[in-house]
Amino acid sequence: MLSQKSIQIIKSTVPLLEKYGVEITSLFYKNMFEAQPQFLNIFNHSNQRNQKQPVALANTILQSAIHIEKLNEINLMPIVHKHVALGITPEMYPIVGAHLLGAMKTVMQDEATPEIMAAWTEAYRAVAQAFMDAEEDLYFETEEQIGGWKDTREFVVDRIEEETPLIKSFYFKAYDGKEIATYIPGQYITVKITLPGDGVDVPTDKMRTYVRHYSLSDKPNDEYYRISIKKELGKNTPNGIVSNHFHNNIKVGDVVPMSVPAGDFVVNNDSETPILLICGGVGINPLFSMLKETLVQQPDRKINFIFSTHCESSQPFKEELKQLEDDYKETGNLKINLVYSENQGHINKEIIEKYSTQHVDQAEIAETDVYICGPVPFMMQVNKDLLQLGFHKENVHYELFGPLTPVLEENQMLRGVKNIIEN
């Protein structure tokens, strides 16, 4: 727990963080990568170039200062899971802290008084210790589970299926032939790919390890992991390095190192309330896993699945969705609604109202479990529309691909105020 004096001092720095936040975090990353180049193998540098990462971290620090007295209420687990997937160790925290606090002092200069620096040092140590304790527990849990492991394990590509012109599904089996860990629908695996530098962050004559998280897109099973990767083609930006490598170069028989499944954006199959799954684009992946597993575990549960994409040719899992619709037609509990923006326009309040209330009454709306995944503007609009329609904000859950940024309202945003090391 922080002292009351430190809490008051940190709150007093909010105007400074509003003024200097992104400058601080940009300098932090620059200095840390120069001094610790091995960290280049942990962080996604495209998020550095487009400023998503510095902006996200600056917002995290700002929100931490605003809500500093509520730090013990913050859910650390989304970032704890990500840290375990990345292999973050306790030895890294002092390094990160030194560079972060050093950047604060450099940017704020005389405004960073000894009292302010002492308070932020105390706060960083408290947050770092909370992360280290939680990560130690999760490392043990994931390694000791049946089929579990620590760090990375080699998996071989068993088959590849083209879902759309830009999305391919890759099926992985354990290279050693041993059991694999199960997972909860909504979780992701983390792949580590070593490639020549991109010529921007790393020279082309040097190798670099790229780390990416990919949501598992099938229901849990004991044979394989499936991830469905969209080929990211940049618009006035470079193409996605790892996604293009998978599409252009990875073939059946190739071996890929990966971390154990992780993530806390997971479906609650202990609840019997209706479930609403709303996804856009490649955000379908974790929600499709949730859909398939919920149908197996809770065939009598009311499920509404809404998927928005540009057109029919950009829709993955066509045959699987059709088969699910046919298999559960008689129960009347499953509703699948496809929204093609090419014809219907982007998803909006009217569309959500039309489809989300198909087989639930007004009383059930307030208790419906909602899961959202897709582009940030999509999720912000969907969340706003859902709240206006009477869905309860405590029941709205979301997954963000990339650095954590606030998607929902302030009290929900506290879920995102959690990281010092962020991928």
From Swiss-Prot:
Top-level taxon in the UniProt lineage: Eukaryota
**Which EC class is this protein assigned?**
oxidoreductase
Region listing for Reductase, in residue ranges? 149-423
Glycoprotein is among the record's keywords: no
Q: Which residues form the active site?
A: Y93, E135
Write down what this protein is called.
Flavohemoprotein B
Co-factor binding details: Binds 1 FAD per subunit.
Gene behind the chain: fhbB
Q: Give residue numbers for the site Involved in heme-bound ligand stabilization and O-O bond activation.
A: Y29
GO (cellular component) term, any one: cytoplasm
Which residues take part in binding heme b? H83
In this chain the Globin domain maps to: 1-136
The induction text for this entry reads: By submerged conditions, in growing cells.
**Cofactor needs:** FAD; heme b
User: Which UniProt key words apply to this protein?
Assistant: Cytoplasm, Detoxification, FAD, Flavoprotein, Heme, Iron, Metal-binding, NAD, NADP, Oxidoreductase, Oxygen transport, Transport
Entry EC number(s):
1.14.12.17
The entry marks the following residues as binding FAD, namely: Y188, R212, H213, Y214, S215, L400, F401, G402, P403
Organism lineage string: Eukaryota, Amoebozoa, Evosea, Eumycetozoa, Dictyostelia
Q: Which GO terms describe its biological process?
A: cellular response to glucose stimulus; cellular response to nitrosative stress; nitric oxide catabolic process; response to toxic substance
What is this enzyme's catalytic activity, as reactions? 2 nitric oxide + NADPH + 2 O2 = 2 nitrate + NADP(+) + H(+); 2 nitric oxide + NADH + 2 O2 = 2 nitrate + NAD(+) + H(+)
**Where's it found, cell-wise?**
Cytoplasm
Taxonomic source organism = Dictyostelium discoideum
Instruction: Name the residues annotated as site: Influences the redox potential of the prosthetic heme and FAD groups.
Output: K82, E399
Show the GO MF annotations: FAD binding; heme binding; metal ion binding; nitric oxide dioxygenase NAD(P)H activity; oxygen binding; oxygen carrier activity
Function of the protein: Is involved in NO detoxification in an aerobic process, termed nitric oxide dioxygenase (NOD) reaction that utilizes O(2) and NAD(P)H to convert NO to nitrate, which protects the cell from various noxious nitrogen compounds. Therefore, plays a central role in the inducible response to nitrosative stress. In the presence of oxygen and NADH, it has NADH oxidase activity, which leads to the generation of superoxide and H(2)O(2). Under anaerobic conditions, it also exhibits nitric oxide reductase and FAD reductase activities. However, all these reactions are much lower than NOD activity.
Q: What is known of its domains?
A: Consists of two distinct domains; a N-terminal heme-containing oxygen-binding domain and a C-terminal reductase domain with binding sites for FAD and NAD(P)H.
One of its Pfam families is Globin
